[in-house]
A protein has these predicted regions:
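C-terminal capping/extension of enzyme domains
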Residues: 45-64, 86, 133-146, 169-209
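Internal catalytic-core helix/loop-beta-alpha segment
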Residues: 115-163
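Residue-level detector of structural "landmarks"
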Residues: 3, 7-9
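Short alpha-helix boundary/capping segments
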Residues: 12-24
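Short, hydrophobic/glycine-enriched beta-strand segments
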Residues: 64-70
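Short, Lys/Arg-enriched N-terminal segments with co-localized hydrophobic residues
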Residues: 33-44
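Short, surface-exposed acidic-centric catalytic microdomains
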Residues: 75-136
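Short hydrophobic targeting helices and cationic amphipathic motifs
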Residues: 25-28, 35
Length: 209
């Protein structure tokens, strides 16, 4: 019976009922690492990678506020746009603040931001990071936010979460010299804040739009 016979190509371990299977056994089934995925993901999530931001800010001449995250998550880097994780509540919260329908596509998100005077980017342009872990960030190269501010009407900065706020104060505050308010993170990792609570706090803070 070959039903329980499996080998993982990346480890070379062959097990059937706790016994070794010969390499030439007809029961041997090889599962490549890129299909199994577990060890590859584990290594990826545990290793530092030095990564550039990968996509540009959203703003125009009419932008009045700037919302900053820390650095794009893995999902955002894959989609080449902000807050790409399906459980991140940024777009739900911002749409509620602006009294807009929640945008679904990247183009709809851009259109809403530009029409409502909201610029979005991140504090960091390049860094070493493990996966999406803000706490692992090191080797920081700050983003050139001055370009955004000079080409717009931005008068206030909001940071999405404590890490973004901390990084902003360390790398950007003196350069931009704008009022900044730190808002609770919309990340799914911030489980202490419900969608309703986030929306309430963000709505009280953001009045310029």
């Amino acid at each position: 019976d070959c039903r329980n016979s499996v080998v993982r190509e990346e480890t070379g371990s062959e097990i059937k009922n706790n016994e070794k299977i010969r390499e030439d056994s007809p029961c041997l089934v090889k599962i490549p690492l890129f299909l199994g995925g577990f060890k590859k993901r584990s290594r990826y999530m545990k290793e530092y990678q030095n990564i550039s931001h990968g996509f540009g800010p959203v703003y125009n001449r009419e932008s009045r506020i700037l919302i900053l995250g820390s650095f794009p998550s893995v999902k955002s880097r894959e989609q080449a746009f902000f807050y790409g994780h399906p459980r991140n509540r940024f777009w739900k919260v911002l749409a509620a603040v602006l009294k807009e329908d929640e945008p679904e596509t990247v183009e709809e998100k851009k259109e809403m931001l530009l029409r409502r005077g909201v610029a979005v980017y991140d504090v960091i342009e390049q860094c070493s990071i493990i996966g999406s872990s803000d706490s692992s960030i090191k080797d920081v190269v700050p983003a050139n936010l001055g370009i955004i501010v000079e080409a717009s009407q931005i008068r206030k900065v909001y940071t999405n979460g404590k890490t973004a706020g901390k990084l902003y104060r360390k790398y950007q505050d003196k350069e931009l010299n704008l009022p900044m308010e730190e808002l609770p993170s919309t990340s799914p990792a911030n489980a202490a804040y419900s969608l309703e609570k986030l929306t309430e706090i963000w709505s009280r803070a953001i009045v310029e739009v």
